[in-house]
Amino acid sequence: MSRVCQVTGKRPAVGNNRSHALNATRRRFLPNLHTHRFWVESENRFVTLRLTAKGMRIIDKKGIDAVLAEIRARGEKI
């Protein structure tokens, strides 16, 4: 399963570790992903999403129905 947030689309980024001597070694910055079940009242069922902490805050703000509509408009199957 890919490390991508289903709400924000955030995915791993690449950069450098920097030592005290400023030596650079490549690394990946991974998103803060969680698998979370949300109760969708309109569909009378649970929906499981893989999303970041920011994605959870967006759902708290907009509501699960609005966010699911946006995800489905992108063509993602839920």
Curated annotation (Swiss-Prot):
GO cellular component, one term: cytosolic large ribosomal subunit
Chain intervals for the UniProt region annotation (Disordered): 1-20
GO terms of biological process kind: translation
Record InterPro entries: Ribosomal_bL28 (IPR026569), Ribosomal_bL28/bL31-like_sf (IPR034704), Ribosomal_bL28_bact-type (IPR001383), Ribosomal_bL28_sf (IPR037147)
One of the record's GO molecular function terms: structural constituent of ribosome
Disulphide-bridged cysteine pairs: none
Alphabetical keyword list: Ribonucleoprotein, Ribosomal protein
PANTHER family according to UniProt: 39S RIBOSOMAL PROTEIN L28, MITOCHONDRIAL (PTHR13528), LARGE RIBOSOMAL SUBUNIT PROTEIN BL28M (PTHR13528:SF2)
HAMAP family for this protein: Ribosomal_bL28 (MF_00373)
Family: Belongs to the bacterial ribosomal protein bL28 family.
Name the record gives this protein: Large ribosomal subunit protein bL28
